[in-house]
């Protein structure tokens, strides 16, 4: 969003897997994330999805301004991202890999394994006004 009411078109190639720091220890491994150091934004909100029923899908929206990191803390799931032109599917199954999703990217999460936990780090507090929940509306914004 550029402040003038027009949105910058986001490209799918800005979204990427970030290899998070790992400390290997025989007592158990540790991964940590520091905002603006390991990821390209400050963390203002953290939430997680769990007990997702088999066959269920999450997501199905885009954000106008929000940046996110999506991590499979336990188990696995797929994230399908779409910029209005291209689609890419990421299979997340390692707790030290985070998928960076920039603003104006449609995302859908599916293929959740039993017991999976999805952790999301967000660049801002919740705001319903930041959501685009209608794909045709998203598509027309991307093409305008």
Put a short name on every predicted segment.
Residues 5-97, 114-115, 120, 126-137, ...:
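Non-catalytic, conserved peripheral segments adjacent to functional cores
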Residues 108, 125-126:
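Short coil/turn motifs at secondary-structure junctions
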Residues 94-99, 104-111:
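Well-ordered alpha/beta subsegment
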């Amino acid at each position: 969003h550029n402040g003038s009411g027009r949105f910058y078109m986001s490209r799918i190639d800005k979204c990427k897997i970030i290899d998070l720091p790992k400390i290997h220890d025989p007592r158990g491994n540790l991964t940590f994330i520091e905002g603006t150091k390991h990821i390209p934004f400050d963390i203002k909100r953290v939430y997680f999805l769990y007990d997702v029923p088999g066959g269920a899908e999450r997501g199905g929206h885009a954000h106008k301004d929000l940046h996110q990191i999506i991590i499979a803390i336990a188990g696995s799931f797929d994230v399908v991202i779409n910029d209005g032109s291209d689609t890419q599917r990421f299979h997340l199954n390692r707790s030290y890999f985070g998928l960076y999703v920039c603003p104006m990217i449609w995302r859908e999460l599916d293929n959740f394994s039993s017991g999976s936990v999805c952790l999301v780090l967000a660049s801002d507090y919740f705001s319903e006004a930041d959501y685009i929940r209608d794909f045709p509306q998203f598509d027309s914004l991307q093409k305008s």
